[in-house]
Amino acid sequence: MKQSLVAIFCLIAISLSAQSWDIFTPVNGALHNYGGTSTAAGEYVVGLLREDDDFLKGHIVFIDKEGNYKLKTFLNDKYNTMLCGAIGFENGNALVVGGMNWAGEGKERSILLVMVVNPDLDVITEHRYEIDESLDHISSTAYLEYDENGDIILALQCGIMNNSVFEGVPYMCKLDTEGNLLKTKCIDEDLGISGRDITGMTMVPNSNQILLFASGLFYGANLGACYLDEDFNVLNKYLTHRGIFRYYSNFWIDNEHFIASTIETEDVGPYNIYDVTLYEVDKEFNYYNTLVLHRADTSTVTAQITSIVPINENYMYVAGFKPVFNSNVISDIVVWIVDKNLNVHGAKTLARDNSYNYLLGCQGTTEEGGVILYGHSKLLDNTEMMSIWKLIPEDFGLSLSVNEVAQDNSKTAVYPNPTNEVINIPVRDLKGNYSISIWDMSGIKYFDMSVDKEGEELSVDVSSL
């Protein structure tokens, strides 16, 4: 990294704008499930587009380091083409995976599509694998990581129709860097319950073990995790946390502890509240530090952490989206800089006015120590677009910290970029003590207060401080 991370702590940045590019605006189309990867040449973003009365089309966008982009569409006759993941090579090329799902007459069949592409989006090699003739669908969810031998581990979400009900079927694959399929295994029976969705994967440091997260383990829709060996045999299974229905991890503190993001439910009166939380977790799923990045209200728009991108061994970008307070149609994309002890050192909101913005993913870091994000915006007139942002540490501004102490549990919620606005903080029905502070990236507090309230909201007019 050319730029020292000292800049994160010594610069007060309140209203700097990030670089951004709108890629395309399909008036009658909907963008879905983009994944991507960083390479030496730039960023690959892959996904799919649904247009009215048309097949699903796979898309690859390549963005170079200056923000210039190329777009290529992949459509295979009578197949819905769903590109869902990519992993980069040192030479600037990338391996892209996706599903080709039959949309014509006759028996349905699903094919795993594997391509190696270059920055000009030329297809260097292409492979098509029918990994299981019983599959009805290869979904738009895939996680790719390198193992210790340099091969590529692919966790792929597939599915079958069972009595008109779609059931998720998790598959594990191993590929070489030319896209040859070396090994594949359905791990559904090993896990014991069908109908799961894969929600995350990470390689365990200094081993060829795989840590896989999936819903549906043990008890219906609750979330679980399992360790797999290099032959995709299940070693250990864990029920990670009741009430959590998303899980993602990509930051190992050491060989035994990692940072994971979750969305978890909490019953508050007649509502289910969805909190976005970071945890420090060990390999046996004991929980340590906790950081609530978004304290949800009763909105029907669910907040979510989409990506954790390591900056170095001590710091990470944590990116996701959250609803605007008390709204079920408007949401913002948010990026935080967080250290391994779960302290927040900066935050940035990316939003279009009066639109539903959600983050599809992010990659990094750039030569300046920054991060590339790609998101989807749906305007109130139903126009949809994909946008790409480039952030560097100087783009990050003030943050509002709310520390809640209730029923012997202490959690810290962070509200980014509160300058010149009133922050409304929902207070739970449970009585709690709150301390509120605002600081800059050098750690200087501007404001501090303690509150003891019950069953209402706190309002802080940041512009008057």
For each feature predicted by the language model, list its residue ranges.
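Bacterial Sec-dependent N-terminal signal peptides
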Residues: 1-21, 402, 417, 444
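Detector for intrinsically disordered, low-structure N-terminal pre-sequences
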Residues: 5, 11-13, 96, 203, ...
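Compositionally biased non-globular segments, especially hydrophobic aliphatic-rich helices
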Residues: 10, 16, 217-219, 422
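Residue-level signal for pocket-adjacent positions within structured domains
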Residues: 11, 124, 182, 288, ...
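A sequence-level/structural motif corresponding to short, flexible coil/turn segments enriched
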Residues: 19-403
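C-terminal outer-membrane/trafficking sorting elements
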Residues: 406-415, 419-465
